[in-house]
Structures are given as structure tokens and as C-alpha cells.
């Protein structure tokens, strides 16, 4: 069975790209701003999928980013997500965006291989 991992970079107070992550972030997936550092503590957000029985090639999955504790966790403004095979840096699969007001796809190594925020508005999920 092929193991897949979703990788996300959430940054709280970093000056970044208000219209989504740049394609220069496709490999490293880390903020490149001199105005802030990556978060060093556990993320207050979680990534969930509907892949309860593991990865099956060709199947469509829903990926959701949400707050772990919605009462004490601030909304987020930026995200960048890819699906990768464990140990590799090349994204696999494609994304379809459910809400075009919040997110957009990015073409990293192939069409729609990543998804990122669309604007600087806050996002609750």
C-alpha cells in the first residue's frame, strides 16, 4: 500500500503572499519572509481527510483544515497544502477547490498539484 502524507504550512504572524503561496514554495513549503519565523510549537490546527480505509489510487478524497479548539484558536489567513508520498518532495494527485472564494490551486510539478489561500481574508475552516 502506498503511504501518503498531507503537508501543510500554517503561519500566524508572518508577512506573506496575500494572494496565495508563490510557486517558489512548491518544494520547501516554508515561509521565506524576513519578517517572521516558522511556528515552533504544536499547530492549533488539524488536517483531516475522509480516507478512513487508507489511500486508493484514483479515488477522490476531501481534505479539511480546521481549528483544534475553535474557542481559543485564531482564524488563519494563509495555507499551502500538497499530498506527497512519504519521504519525497514531489506532490502527487490534483486538487479541486470546493470554495473558490477561499482557496485556489497552484501548478507546482503538474496542474493543480497544490492548493493555497486566495486572498488575505481570515478563514475559519
Show where each model-derived region lies.
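Structured recognition/catalytic domains enriched at protein termini
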Residues: 2-125
Amino acid at each position: 500500500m502506498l503511504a501518503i502524507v498531507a503537508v501543510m504550512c500554517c503561519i500566524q504572524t508572518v508577512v506573506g503572499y496575500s494572494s496565495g503561496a508563490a510557486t517558489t514554495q512548491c518544494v520547501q513549503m516554508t515561509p521565506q519572509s524576513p519578517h517572521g519565523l516558522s511556528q515552533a510549537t504544536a499547530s492549533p490546527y488539524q488536517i483531516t481527510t475522509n480516507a478512513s480505509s487508507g489511500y486508493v489510487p484514483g479515488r477522490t478524497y476531501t481534505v479539511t483544515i480546521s481549528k483544534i479548539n475553535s474557542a481559543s484558536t485564531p482564524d488563519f489567513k494563509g495555507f499551502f497544502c500538497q499530498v506527497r508520498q512519504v519521504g519525497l518532495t514531489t506532490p502527487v494527485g490534483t486538487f479541486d477547490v470546493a470554495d473558490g472564494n477561499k482557496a485556489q490551486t497552484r501548478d507546482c510539478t503538474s496542474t493543480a498539484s497544490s492548493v493555497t489561500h486566495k486572498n488575505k481574508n481570515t478563514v475559519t475552516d
